A protein has these predicted regions:
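N-terminal capping/lid subdomain adjacent to the active-site entrance of alpha/beta enzymes
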Residues: 1-153
Length: 153
């Protein structure tokens, strides 16, 4: 049997980051933490994270939906269906369940990326800013070996 809880964590950006919806300095995330009562030392953790205005999840109902997940954690199939309008919570739940299956190792899938601990150098993100700031980011990402850059403009 599983038990669940969640905690909220506010990420503090190292630098203000421009998006099409404005400048981000902080971002809230919630961590869904599962524990198997048969193996209480093993935790599965999944991150539920949104960017307000860009994510379809309803922020006003977010924590009550997370509480609903915690109260109904042993009805996995029904939960996944009930979360259709909260894809970020659904993702966090699926991740936490996979982590429990992986004995809390955080190695959810066997892959070269996981085994070699090397980054996947695609989609280097370039944050919005003035021309010089963006050009410096582009130069750095290319030097790091990224083959595709995503510019926030």
């Amino acid at each position: 049997m599983l038990k669940a809880r969640f905690i909220k964590h506010t990420l503090q950006f190292k630098q203000a980051s421009g998006t099409s919806r404005g400048v981000l300095k902080t971002k809230d995330s919630w961590f869904l933490i599962l524990c198997d009562t048969d193996n209480p030392n093993t935790q599965g953790i999944g991150e539920c994270s949104i960017i307000e205005g860009l994510s379809p999840d309803n922020l006003e109902e977010y924590e009550s939906k997370l509480q609903f997940v915690c109260e109904n954690i042993n009805q996995k199939e029904q939960l996944l269906i009930a979360l259709s309008k909260f894809p970020s919570i659904q993702f966090g739940l699926e991740t936490a369940l996979l982590d429990i299956q992986a004995n809390g190792s955080k190695n959810l899938f066997r892959s070269h990326f996981v085994r070699s601990n090397s980054p996947i150098k695609i989609n280097g993100l370039i944050w919005m800013g003035n021309k010089d700031f963006m050009l410096e980011q582009i130069k750095t990402k290319i030097e790091l070996g990224f083959s595709c850059l995503k510019l926030k403009i």
